[in-house]
């Protein structure tokens, strides 16, 4: 489909250290067709996984139809904040934006994987990834340290 970049090409670009593939948004009518095929849950949401081009999973969030539409049309990742009940444009307050490189829907059409160009860190704790609690035989262990403090990240 025209709305995704070729993953093989992306992998070659990343391995050479070249610039990322530029996301080319589909026409609004194609975005509407894609969204019509998505199976949103009873709350009108799908899970949205953000992954860096090197394969690191950055975060898991939620999207409603409006967030998915905005993301696909603009290439700037937008989520749905369940706690604030409003659109959450990643990096709006912190500057830690995500630019879409590629989007893929899963086989059930109820989850989206986004390969993103992450500015700064993805996690509100100041870490690159939100997935830093490693499970060990002795319990949980932090697998990474913050790259930036919350005070620096949010100016608090």
Swiss-Prot record:
<dbReference type="Pfam" id="PF01502">
    <property type="entry name" value="PRA-CH"/>
</dbReference>
<feature type="binding site">
    <location>
        <position position="107"/>
    </location>
    <ligand>
        <name>Zn(2+)</name>
    </ligand>
</feature>
<keyword id="KW-0862">Zinc</keyword>
<dbReference type="GO" id="GO:0004635">
    <property type="term" value="F:phosphoribosyl-AMP cyclohydrolase activity"/>
</dbReference>
<dbReference type="GO" id="GO:0008270">
    <property type="term" value="F:zinc ion binding"/>
</dbReference>
<comment type="function">
    <text>Catalyzes the hydrolysis of the adenine ring of phosphoribosyl-AMP.</text>
</comment>
<keyword id="KW-0378">Hydrolase</keyword>
<comment type="similarity">
    <text>Belongs to the PRA-CH family.</text>
</comment>
<dbReference type="InterPro" id="IPR026660">
    <property type="entry name" value="PRA-CH"/>
</dbReference>
<comment type="subunit">
    <text>Homodimer.</text>
</comment>
<feature type="binding site">
    <location>
        <position position="110"/>
    </location>
    <ligand>
        <name>Mg(2+)</name>
    </ligand>
</feature>
<dbReference type="GO" id="GO:0000105">
    <property type="term" value="P:L-histidine biosynthetic process"/>
</dbReference>
<feature type="binding site">
    <location>
        <position position="106"/>
    </location>
    <ligand>
        <name>Mg(2+)</name>
    </ligand>
</feature>
<keyword id="KW-0479">Metal-binding</keyword>
<keyword id="KW-0368">Histidine biosynthesis</keyword>
<protein>
    <recommendedName>
        <fullName>Phosphoribosyl-AMP cyclohydrolase</fullName>
        <ecNumber>3.5.4.19</ecNumber>
    </recommendedName>
</protein>
<keyword id="KW-0460">Magnesium</keyword>
<dbReference type="InterPro" id="IPR038019">
    <property type="entry name" value="PRib_AMP_CycHydrolase_sf"/>
</dbReference>
<feature type="binding site">
    <location>
        <position position="130"/>
    </location>
    <ligand>
        <name>Zn(2+)</name>
    </ligand>
</feature>
<feature type="binding site">
    <location>
        <position position="108"/>
    </location>
    <ligand>
        <name>Mg(2+)</name>
    </ligand>
</feature>
<feature type="binding site">
    <location>
        <position position="123"/>
    </location>
    <ligand>
        <name>Zn(2+)</name>
    </ligand>
</feature>
<keyword id="KW-0963">Cytoplasm</keyword>
<dbReference type="GO" id="GO:0005737">
    <property type="term" value="C:cytoplasm"/>
</dbReference>
<dbReference type="GO" id="GO:0000287">
    <property type="term" value="F:magnesium ion binding"/>
</dbReference>
<comment type="pathway">
    <text>Amino-acid biosynthesis; L-histidine biosynthesis; L-histidine from 5-phospho-alpha-D-ribose 1-diphosphate: step 3/9.</text>
</comment>
<keyword id="KW-0028">Amino-acid biosynthesis</keyword>
<dbReference type="InterPro" id="IPR002496">
    <property type="entry name" value="PRib_AMP_CycHydrolase_dom"/>
</dbReference>
């Amino acid at each position: 489909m025209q709305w995704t970049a070729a993953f093989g090409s992306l992998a070659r670009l990343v391995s050479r250290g070249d610039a990322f593939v530029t996301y080319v948004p589909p026409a609004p009518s194609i975005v509407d067709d894609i969204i019509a095929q998505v199976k949103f849950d009873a709350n009108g949401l799908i899970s949205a996984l953000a992954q860096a081009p090197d394969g690191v999973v950055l975060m898991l969030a939620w999207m409603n139809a409006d967030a998915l539409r905005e993301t696909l049309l603009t290439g700037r990742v937008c989520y749905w904040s369940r706690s604030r009940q409003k659109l959450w444009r990643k990096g709006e307050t912190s500057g830690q934006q995500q630019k879409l490189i590629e989007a893929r829907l899963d086989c059930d059409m109820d989850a989206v994987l986004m390969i993103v160009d992450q500015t700064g860190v993805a996690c509100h704790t100041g870490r690159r990834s939100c997935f830093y609690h490693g499970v060990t035989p002795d319990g949980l262990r932090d697998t990474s340290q913050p790259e930036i403090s919350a005070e620096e990240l949010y100016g608090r």
